Structure formats: structure tokens, C-alpha cells
């Protein structure tokens, strides 16, 4: 009985998301679960060139849009 209870606790911990992660798009199809609570997309000349976790700095030619909800960088 203790083994069953321990197994249920472990499965619950692994399945629950305690709000410390966010799911970000890497491409149109693929996503990644990130520890950082921020997603970004880099845009240049009206084309999205990169997506991922975190919030990198912008430059004159590259605009970066950062957001903080699941799959918000689409």
C-alpha cells in the first residue's frame, strides 16, 4: 500500500505544472517547455527568424517580441 501511495505521489508531482514553466514555440510545429517564464520571437523585415525561451535584446534591424503565456510566441 505504501508503494502504491508513493507511486501516486511521484506521478502527481511529475504531471503537475506548478507554474514555474511555460511552453514556447520553437517553430510553427514544435514547442519546448521552458524553465524561463518568458517566450520570444525575433522579427526582421516582416519575417519571423527565431522563436524560443527567454527575452534576448533587440537591435536596430531585429525586433524582439516577448510574452509570458503558453504558446504566445506564434
From Swiss-Prot:
It is found in: Secreted. Gene3D superfamilies: CD59. GO terms for molecular function: toxin activity. Disulfide bonds join 24-39, 34-53, 55-66, 67-72. Its main location: secreted. One of its GO terms (cellular component) is extracellular region. Expressed by the venom gland. The keyword Signal applies. It comes from the Eukaryota. Keywords: Disulfide bond, Secreted, Signal, Toxin. Residues 1-21 form the signal peptide. Belongs to the three-finger toxin family. Short-chain subfamily. This is Three-finger toxin MALT0065C. It comes from Micrurus altirostris (Uruguayan coral snake).
Amino acid at each position: 500500500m505504501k508503494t502504491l501511495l508513493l507511486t501516486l505521489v511521484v506521478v502527481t508531482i511529475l504531471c503537475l505544472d506548478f507554474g514555474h514553466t511555460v511552453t514556447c514555440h520553437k517553430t510553427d510545429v514544435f514547442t519546448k517547455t521552458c524553465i524561463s517564464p518568458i517566450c520570444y520571437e525575433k522579427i526582421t523585415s516582416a519575417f519571423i527568424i527565431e522563436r524560443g525561451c527567454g527575452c534576448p535584446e533587440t537591435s536596430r534591424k531585429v525586433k524582439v517580441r516577448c510574452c509570458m503565456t503558453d504558446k504566445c510566441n506564434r
